[in-house]
Amino acid sequence: MIVVVIADKEFYGWAESVPYARYDESISTSTKQIKALFCDRSFTRKMELSELINTLPAGAARNALDCAMWDLQAKQSTRPVAEILSKTSITSICAHTLSIDTPKAMQEAVLAMNSPPLVKVKLDKQDIIARMTAIANAAPHSQFIVDANEDWCFRDLEENVEALKALNVVLIEQPLPAGEDEQLINFTSPIPLCADESCHTENDLPYLQGRYQVVNIKLDKTGGLTQACSLASKAQKMGFDIMLGCMVGSSLAMAPASLLASQARYVDLDGPLLVLKDRKHHFTYADGQMSPLQSCLWGGAHNSERFFVDRLQLQ
């Protein structure tokens, strides 16, 4: 992960992003993008810095900078980001992720989750129905999102979708590889289909119409909260439902995205459950629900995690 801090003489803003190898990103390449942007530059206007950040492509580097700018603006204006954007921080049902394994192991894993309302199940093209049947039998009161991670072919989708619907699957995420989505044109799926790897910014939406019914918004794909807000607004106007997704990161990485939860039909921001140590003022997850954002973590007029920022040594 990357943590970025942007400061003036009195205030600072911070944010976290997670470079993703699927998009040819790494901590090294993203850090180089950020350093190159600021090399031998000083700024006298916030707008000047914002314009420079927007010259970066959508991705993890821009995400960290954009969200740090929002946090800084909250401190400078003494107005929380939620207030600036007219958003409400809410408690939301959050999907818990179930990783690929044998049917028996996945069944045992979902049993240990204690009947969560929503489970995201990672499924490749092997044993699709056998795995899903074992999981559904162990959690008969749960609903499921199946994430194929681009691994299926159209025949896999066509042959399994009816059986998956009977197993309480309510959404299928990125069944086909990005770029092969044209096979979904005129396919009437009994389960809504969600674009993940095929959806990065609002510019992708016209292509996705007629292929998907839901778009997965991840700030590391959009390049920050600014574009995520635009994408969510335009997507809803075009008739798409919203899913909020994330990479594996701490609560700081989830914080900006959580402000869009009230617009989302599906929330999948469980990244902090997969890290060894979370932030001091972190989200809590209980009974399948994710707590509202604590503005003392990010996006508030004050930030009680200043002790962490003071320790950062930016090279």
From Swiss-Prot:
PROSITE patterns: MR_MLE_2 (PS00909). PANTHER family: D-GALACTONATE DEHYDRATASE-RELATED (PTHR48080), ENOLASE SUPERFAMILY MEMBER DDB_G0284701 (PTHR48080:SF3). Pathway: Amino-acid degradation. CDD domains: L-Ala-DL-Glu_epimerase. Binds 1 Mg(2+) ion per subunit. This is N-acetyl-D-glutamate racemase. Its cofactor is Mg(2+). Disruption phenotype: The growth of the deletion mutant is significantly reduced with D-glutamate as the sole nitrogen source. It comes from Pseudoalteromonas sp.
